[in-house]
Structure formats: C-alpha cells, structure tokens
Amino acid sequence: MAELEAVADDLDALIDDLDYLPGHFHLEMQLNFEPRSPAPQRARDLKLQREGLRQELQLAAAPQRPAVRHLLGAFAFYLEELDEARECFLEVAHEHPGNLNAWANLAHVYGRLGQEEEEEACAARLADLMGLAEEPEAAGDPQLRAARCLAEQGYAHGFDVGCASPEERARGLAAGIALYDKALGYGQQIPMEEKRGWYFTMATLYIRLDGIFLELGSEEQKRLPAFNRTLALLRQVLKSEDPRHRALAWCYLGMLLERKDTFSTTPMGVHDCGYSGTDPLDCFGKAIEIAKNQPPILNRLAKIFYFLGKQDMAIGTCNMALDVLRDPELNWQAYCTRAKIHIRAYLHDLKRAKMGLGGMPDRNHLACAKADLEEVVRVCPGFKAYLDIGQVYYYMGVDAVQELLAVDEAALNQALVFLAKAGESELGATLPELQLLRGKCLRIKGEDANAAACFKRAVELDDAGSSHTDGFGCLLEALLAQWSQAQLSDGELGREVDAWLRRAQDKYPAARLRQELQRVWRGHTDEVLGLARALVAQGRPALVRLLFETMEREGEGASAPRDRRAVSF
C-alpha cells in the first residue's frame, strides 16, 4: 500500500513539473465540470454542438482536423458513447501517431472502459512521445508535438458547452487564446501555413470575445489590446494559401472595421496594419470574390452576413452558391440559410406591424422560405428543416397583425404535422422552440389546454439564464384564456400561476421576465385584474403584490440579450 502511495506521489510531482498536460478531459472547460443542467438538456446541447462540429470537419483544413476529431470524441464520451469516443481518438492516433492528445484521450477512455492494459500502453506511448521515458524511442521534435497538442486544446475552448453567463464564456475564450499563445512559443518550427490556421482560430476567438465585451459594456481600454492584435492576426491570415481562411479573414476584417466606430478614437491597430482607408464593404466584397466558385465557403459567408443582419448581402451570397451548385442534396445549406433570411425578414416586419410602426409584412417572404425548405425536406429531411418549415406554415396560417386569428386552417394543420415529425427525433423532442410553436398552433385552433401543456414543456426545456421568455408569457395567456372560459377554477388558476411564476423566477433573468409579464398584463388587463381578485380571495396577497410591482416597473427592464444558441458563428 505504501509503495502504491509513493508511486502516486511521484506521478503527481511529475505532473506538477510539466509545463503542459496532454488530453482534453482535464481542461478547465464547463464540458469537463459537473453539469448544471438536467441530463436531457445537457445531452441536447452536446448533440447540437456535435452536429455543428461534424459540418466543420468537412470544411476544416487538414492540420485542423485532429482538433475537431478530439472534440467529437470528447462529446461522444460525455454522451456515454464510449465506443464512438474510442474510434474518434484511434482515428487520430492512426493518422498522426505522434499526436499527444490522441494517446492521452485514449488512455482516459480505456480507463473508463476498465481496460487497464490498453490504458497503460497508451500512457507509455504518451510518455515516450513527450520525451519522459527512460529510453525514448520516438523520432521527431517533442517541441513540435507539444505545440500541436496545445493548439488543439486551445481550439476546444471555442466549442465549450454549458457556460451559464457571458463572463464564463469570456473566460473560456481567453483560456483558449492563452493556449494558442503557449503553442506558438513551442512551435517555432511549425510550418507557416499551419501557423496561419492557428492565427485564424485565434482571431475567431478574439472576435467572439470582443462581442462579449461589447455585450457587457466593457471599457475601451479592456477591448483595445485584443482588438489591435486581432487585426494583426488577420493580416497574417490574408497571406494564407487556403481560400477558406483568406475569404473568412476578409469577412472578419470587415466586421472589425465596422466595430472601430464603437471606440472613441480609431484603434491604432487599424493604422499599424494599413487599413486606415479601407471600407468594410470592400472587405466583404473581397471575401465574396475569393469564394465565388466555392459553395461551401459562400455558405459560410452567407451565414455570417445573416448573423450580422446584412440580409441583402446574405441573400446575394446564397444565390451565388446556388448558381454554382443548385442540387439541394449537395447544397442544402444555401437553401436553408436563404429560407432563414426570408423568415427573419417576415418576423422583423411583423414585429413592427404589432408596434404600429409599419404596414403589413410581405407574405411573399413566407412563400419563398416555403419553396426553399420544401427542396430541403424532399432530399435530406431532418429535425431542423422540419422545425423551420413548421414555423413557416404557422405564420402562413395566422393573421399578419397580432397572431390571434386563423386565416388558413390547412396551413396550421400542416405546421403541426411537420412539428410532429421534428419531435420524432431525439433532439427535436428536447427543443423548447418546437414546443413553443406547437403551443401557438394549438392556441390559434382554440385548444387552450393542449397549448398550455406545450408551453409548460417549453419552459421546462429552456436553459437556466435563457432570455427566451416567450413560452412563459404564452403559458400565462393560455391559463387566463382557460380561466375566462370557465375551464379552470379560481383556485386552479391561482395554483398554476403561483407554481409557474416561481419556476420562471428561478430560470429567467429578472429584467427579461419583468418585460414578459408587462406584455401579458398590457394585453389582458381585465383578466389580470380578475386574477388578482381571485388570488386575494385565496389568501395569496404576496403573489398579487409581485404582479402589480411588475406592472409599476414598466420600462425599467434592459433589452434582452441574445440567447447562447444564436450567437455562435
């Protein structure tokens, strides 16, 4: 026993002396920490992130593919798909026998599987590659292996799962950048083209970090050094031989030059890098020019333009991709992105119409989105396509003023059919967006009890800290509708409102919840006053006080931040 303890102490001392530690399962990422969310939500988030990574793997340059495969293996591990995780790491080890993370991650998986001999063999191979064996046999430079190991770990921080706040996401991105810096210190002899791939990922992490700083209202001096460095990194990436990196670097440069106006004076990095007179639109134009014959790159650019709110540019880029490759089976991404742009345009106009700031939204947007999504559903159906086309049919079925009246019963029924298909998939069944849409369809059809059940499920599935309070607001409206139609008694309504308001307080930011309650109260004043009387009669004055305090604070709430799932490009 004493001998084993001595060996363990020696191992701990050795690890403490190391400047870096291979593998992904020790990294300080939320992925590796005890989950905060319930198991179904965590599994959903892991699978959604994994789906995005699989698409990334198809586009990634060869030197970056091991980093993507390591993450796919880590996600499979935490989804209890241990055989899949092992295969991911074995694939890297076979293609790149000197990859440190592959052997470290394999050792971790074998340990979990209880295969001690394989675990020890991986550990021995790892020690040899790191130059820690008594008689090292591995050829090659351990410094280069260390550099690539650290770069792969830095890449992983850009795809963390489970961050509960912007501050947590910022810390993770900063940790990823620090690992890349460390990798550059070890990797003096790394080929320049491979380094440019690192610079590209670093610039991406920096841009996301700056976006968080903007969201948090951070001081200029906190943003400035990183902003200037990002410009310098992108200038290096523009020399890359990889057209994808070059095109995206021009696009990111355009984004940064647009952000320079958020500083009181132009950041010095703009002048140092020679971009003093550069117009952001010229940068976007150069990105499109580089990608003009390559649909995968055009599709990525279109997505970025979509997230930036540049809808005309996004539509044009999608059209270019479809001019090159119209087959929806091979280029479904362009159809999906173009449909999303039309849906967003319709929703933007609908919101303005509800506020009395514009006329009726153009329903041609819905027709265009429907046509694109029908092409996708025909050749490669999936829960996302079903959800999107279900959303389109919902808006085709309701009025274009307040979403209160059915104008096309057949469209509403078709929406429910597509949403049911989306819900058949394991992932689709865990999406709050799907339950919210189902509830809205059922509410318009007059099925308030069924609608309320869907809205409850949407609230249950929402992440803690989510800004999407729509499901809770719709639930309150459905409960009030049932009560006004005598489908719920005063006591039942009071208990339901009490229980779900407490749950909402635990889940949503206070300011955002207040805004949602204000919206419901403004639209249903008579019902709310009736609810208040019923609650007083039930001896629930504290709940009444909370409701009326909410109404009195109208206008205090800050604008809602975007949800985590919507900000990643």
Curated annotation (Swiss-Prot):
Record has Repressor as a keyword = no
Q: Name one Pfam family in it.
A: TPR_8
Instruction: Give UniProt keywords alphabetically.
Output: Repeat, TPR repeat
Which SUPFAM superfamilies does the protein's record reference? TPR-like
Renumbered ranges of TPR repeats: 66-99, 101-133, 203-237, 260-294, 295-328, 383-418, 432-465
InterPro entries registered for this protein in UniProt:
TPR-like_helical_dom_sf, TPR_rpt, TTC22
Tell me the PANTHER family matching this sequence.
TETRATRICOPEPTIDE REPEAT PROTEIN 22 (PTHR16253:SF0)
This protein is called Tetratricopeptide repeat protein 22
Organism in which the protein naturally occurs: Homo sapiens
